[in-house]
Amino acid sequence: MSYVRSKICGITRIEDALAAAEAGADAIGFVFYAKSPRAVDVRQARAIITELPPFVTTVGLFVNASRCELNEILEVVPLDLLQFHGDETPQDCEGYHRPWIKALRVRPGDDLEAACKQYAGARGILLDTYVAGVPGGTGEAFDWSLVPAHLSKPIILAGGLSADNVGQAIAQVRPYAVDVSGGVEQAKGIKDAAKIEAFMRAVKQA
């Protein structure tokens, strides 16, 4: 099987970002959504990014942010990739001069290929667990059998992943990448270096 990339999301501390990079994570994610327990401000995110080694992609997660708010963040924080995790239309995701991905919360009956075509400009589609009223970070996995074997966009699998189940998830879904947050934490927003290492080891062994 081809190399499966990984993102550690919900980074709030420099030491957690460095632990992710040291363990071999391809990307780290910053949550710019005030209602999240993993939210960061622009000063936090910028300070963390300045300490990162090269070749670690920085991702900003946004939930129905205004264009003005997002542009203000991008003026300060050097993000490589944008992740839209709310109800954004394809038009809402365009115009920032950054590559972007769109998160979808998966429910039975969803036409994921139609969504891939709808968000034609996305570099990939992130599949997360649907919980009413919660845009993400639920810590719950969804039914992976809902993911078709072949989709026209690279798939990033999220939702309730941990070192214990990511190998099975990769074997079943065969995603382009996996995304973890709560599965490598000791508390919300506080990562656990040993859990990050265990998760990355499981990804590499899958």
Swiss-Prot record:
Its EC number is 5.3.1.24. It holds the Pfam family PRAI. It comes from Pseudomonas putida (strain GB-1). Keywords: Amino-acid biosynthesis, Aromatic amino acid biosynthesis, Isomerase, Tryptophan biosynthesis. Belongs to the TrpF family. It comes from the Bacteria. NCBIfam families: PRK01222.1-4, PRK01222.1-6. One of its GO terms (biological process) is L-tryptophan biosynthetic process. InterPro entries: Aldolase_TIM (IPR013785), PRAI_dom (IPR001240), RibuloseP-bd_barrel (IPR011060), TrpF_fam (IPR044643). The gene is trpF. The keyword Amino-acid biosynthesis applies. CDD domains: PRAI. This is N-(5'-phosphoribosyl)anthranilate isomerase. One of its GO terms (molecular function) is phosphoribosylanthranilate isomerase activity. It catalyses: N-(5-phospho-beta-D-ribosyl)anthranilate = 1-(2-carboxyphenylamino)-1-deoxy-D-ribulose 5-phosphate. Pathway: Amino-acid biosynthesis; L-tryptophan biosynthesis; L-tryptophan from chorismate: step 3/5.
